[in-house]
Amino acid sequence: MSNLLGQKHILPLCLLLPLLVVIPGLLSGSQPVAWLFATDIGQTVLWQIRLPRVLMAFLVGALLAWAGVLIQGMVRNPLADPGLIGVSGGAAVGAALFVVLVASGLALPGWGQTLLAFGGGVLALLVVLKLGLSGQSLQAMSFLILAGIAVNVLASAVIGLLSYMATNEALRQITFWSLGSLSGADWLWVVTMALALTAGLLFWPRR
């Protein structure tokens, strides 16, 4: 009976916890809370800067958690994550390549970094699947993890080469990207992330 009551409280608790994080995130900052609601500039800061960043952080965290769950189910390993099978490394290579190309004078749109990072992650995943799924059953999962580790090592080497070739400013941008930043968050990115999360939930094979 106690286990049943505990399970019933899991969903409300999961819905409540994000609110406990989002609200302090909106109200914390260099300016007092009253300033956010008393001036036009404060309203702009609240609705156009702070709220998109907080929602973006929430959605990105949800997507990362979802990706981790899917990969853990795929490889049947509760310790697996996107970094283990090379997806994160491939995405980092794509993003670093964009920074180096722009620093070299090549004119690329701002969304090109996202596109190259996505393409790098997909390419790394395809390589890992090709190398790792040559076996059968449990052995195939072991091969998959080993292939992911190999791709990660290769990605680290490529990032090291790109960092060596990069200018000081480009190297700083690569470092900031690898650390993660929400400074460029806006409502367009929030909607995009929400659609990506919704699509993942709808098309997830429930097996």
Identify the function of each model-found stretch:
Residues 1-207:
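Alpha-helical transmembrane segments in inner-membrane proteins
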